[in-house]
């Protein structure tokens, strides 16, 4: 039932329209950097928290039914690389990371990608996260407005938005396995 509500909500918000695009692979595959994150529970994205992800790369198969996400998490001053595999069912990807995660992607333009996910941890706590990935280090004013509107549509408070790019000291390169 929750998945159906999630799909309906995201469809109404226009997020799912990107998922059926024929050029999906071209739009999302490549090197990306996390610029901002926002969460329903802001402590889940604070420095050192497992949902504070420093993205590096997204890869997907022919129709993007399977997607590989490469990112770092910082534990103290140390960066740990992760690769998670999302499998698509309808317009939502499902993956195992810090419990179970359901996520969606939305392109803004060739340089900006929005994402939204629900994470249910091992204690059954649910956190909603909305982020923006970019090819560069800054967003234009219009891109920032688009992201803040996205955060609001996802039901996350403005004060829970954090610029994570400034704390990203992890390596630029990743090991693709």
Swiss-Prot record:
Superkingdom classification of source: Eukaryota
Signal peptide: 1-17
GO molecular function list: odorant binding; small molecule binding
SUPFAM superfamilies: Lipocalins (SSF50814)
Induction details: Androgen-regulated, increases in concentration with zinc uptake.
Keywords: Disulfide bond, Nucleus, Secreted, Signal
UniProt GO cellular component terms: extracellular space; nucleus
Compartment(s) of residence: Nucleus; Secreted
Disulphide-bonded residues: 79-170
Similarity comment: Belongs to the calycin superfamily. Lipocalin family.
Alphabetized PANTHER family for the sequence: LIPOCALIN, PROBASIN
Record's protein name: Probasin
Gene that encodes the chain: Pbsn
């Amino acid at each position: 039932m929750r998945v159906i509500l999630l799909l309906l909500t995201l469809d109404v918000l226009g997020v799912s329209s990107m998922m059926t695009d024929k050029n999906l692979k071209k739009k999302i595959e490549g090197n990306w950097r996390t610029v901002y994150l926002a969460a329903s529970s802001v402590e889940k994205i604070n420095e050192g928290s497992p949902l504070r992800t420093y993205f590096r790369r997204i890869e997907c198969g022919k129709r993007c039914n399977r997607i590989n996400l490469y990112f770092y998490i910082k534990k103290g001053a140390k960066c740990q690389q992760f690769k998670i595999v999302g499998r698509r069912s309808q317009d939502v990807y499902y993956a195992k990371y810090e419990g179970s995660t359901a996520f969606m992607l939305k392109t803004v333009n060739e340089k900006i990608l929005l994402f939204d996910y629900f994470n249910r941890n091992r204690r059954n706590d649910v956190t909603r996260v909305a982020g923006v990935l970019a090819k560069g280090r800054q967003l234009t004013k219009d891109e920032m407005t688009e992201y803040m509107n996205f955060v609001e549509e996802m039901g996350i408070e403005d004060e829970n938005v954090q610029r994570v790019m400034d704390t990203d000291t992890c390596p630029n390169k990743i090991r693709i396995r």
